[in-house]
Amino acid sequence: MKYTRIFLVFLLSAGFAFGQRTVTGVVSDPDGLPLPGATVIIDGTTSGVTTDFDGNYSIAVEEGVSLVFSFVGYESQSVVVGSQNTLNISLSEGNQLSEVVVTALGLEREARSLGYAVTTVGSEEIEQKGVADVARTLTGKVAGVNITNTTSTSGSGTNVIIRGMTSITGSNQPLFVVDGVPFNSSTNGESGSFWNGITESSRFLDLDPNSIEKVDVLKGLNATVLYGQQGRNGVILITTKNGSGARPSAKGTEVTVSHSTFVNEPVLPDYQNDYGGGFHQLFGFFFSNGGPNFDPAINDPRQFGPYYLREDANNVYVKHPYDYIANRSLVEPEFADLVGTEYAYRNYRGVENFFDPGLVNTTSLNLRSSGDNGFFNMSFGRTDDEGFTPNNRLRKTNFGLGGAATLENGIRINGTLNYANTDYTTPPIAASLGSGSVSSYTSSIFGDVMYTPRSVDLMGLPYITSDGRSIYYRSGNDIQNPRWTAENAFDAELINRVFGTFGAAYDINDNWTLAYKYGIDNTSQFSEHAQNKGGVDGNATGIYYTSDEIRTIQNHSFTLSFNDQLDDDWSLTALVGADANRETYSGRSTTNENQLVFGVL
């Protein structure tokens, strides 16, 4: 069966490839001038390309799909691919021609004057999406950017790749810059690796998607060179509502309150529903390559051997799985009433019944007041996310202040202050084989539940003894019951983070501007990894690991810039500056093993 499935996958892939062809063309403006860096994306997907310096593109598509062509400052255009192999597109000018992009070191440039690809994602595409992670809200919105989750649990880490895998051992994630200051978005690895099942969140979580004004993704090397080594993997610029004064309120003061509720359902593998556990169509309380058919009219009692008791029109009945648990102290006297009883051999849909619908509630408040000489903004956000995996949850609170003003002496000042509290808990998720977690350090809830045979009543069988030990259907009790894992093992994080900026700028004359910006980012993180004794996977004698970490990053930047608009088509810009960055880290950890009594965690 395994080899048949692999063959079918390759066969279907080949059939899909034959249905595709390559479409080429040029994307230009109304005057016929090519648009370098324009985005061409297959509608409804994350697949796409960008045009080269001459506006040329080439993309493999199927007939009948829609291609969306877009470029900053122009109206997007959607075209259905017919039988043609060439599509030349002329984009009309939109209402964003005067839009500026905050580029390296906080410099504002008109989007059309840039010599590299920039993709802008507005707040309307980020807000109220039921996703607490800013990086995940960008999924499918930026061509060429690959965004993946480390796991499917709520609050787990996110990987963002712009330029492909440029490093084998180092990070491939781009630099995130929030309101002009580099922002630490790493996934903490102090507590262990994903291979060991430590499911850390990313610090993208400390940003509130509902407080973001826009996101600019800088892809080209020229766009990121001013950030040096930090920008080697690309740069993602985030402008928050607290840090942006570019959109004054017509009413003077605006208050926006919003709430959203989303339900999440797991997407599970496709399971067959005709056969139970066994080997070569012979019944057994284990899994290998499939036991007898569930239909009594098809199977033969001889397939069940000594397990067989009786059958009726609907089911075959066998001896209870706990009749065969080798360690009788797990069964007797506690579950002695089950010994000798009959057990229906049927499809229990244990995997599907293990998960519950997840529920995400998000509430946000934004107050904005602006006038002739400045603005003030306050934001508040709260996310309560109950994951569909048992005992997985995310609680997040964000609060932010920001403002800008022009003083009488002409000096412009601005500042932001943000606080984030993130509380994240999940069962451990280690890499797994059919026999359980590959890690000697921890267990794996997905590994244990996904390999459950269809004939095992996962949600009906007892899963824990009175003294706290895991019990499951296999005679050797050598796989940990995932229900036991959900209640007795966890990874948890509690993060308190304060970050903000202060900036000042002064126009020496019409061409020269002197500017200074200070940024601070302080993160305090307490992490726990725990499992009660009595399990099977990982550390069966119990483990409790904790780590305390404090990371502080301070950034100072000074710039002297020159800007002269020579005529309607030509401008001259120059910049000289200095940047200083200081990062401090302190941490400690403890590991406690060989738990003396059951059930203390």
Spans of model-derived segments:
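Surface-exposed loop/interface segments of Gram-negative outer-membrane beta-barrel transport/assembly proteins
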Residues: 112, 172-173, 245-344, 387-392, ...
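Alpha-helical support elements that line or immediately flank enzyme active sites
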Residues: 193-195, 500-506, 520-522
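Short, solvent-exposed loop/edge-beta patches enriched in aromatic
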Residues: 369-374, 407-409, 504-513, 568
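Short, small/polar-rich motifs associated with maturation and membrane association
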Residues: 1-8, 15-400, 404-407, 412-414, ...
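Acidic-histidine catalytic/liganding microenvironments
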Residues: 142, 509, 596
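N-terminal capping/interface segment
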Residues: 6, 105-107, 346, 503-513, ...
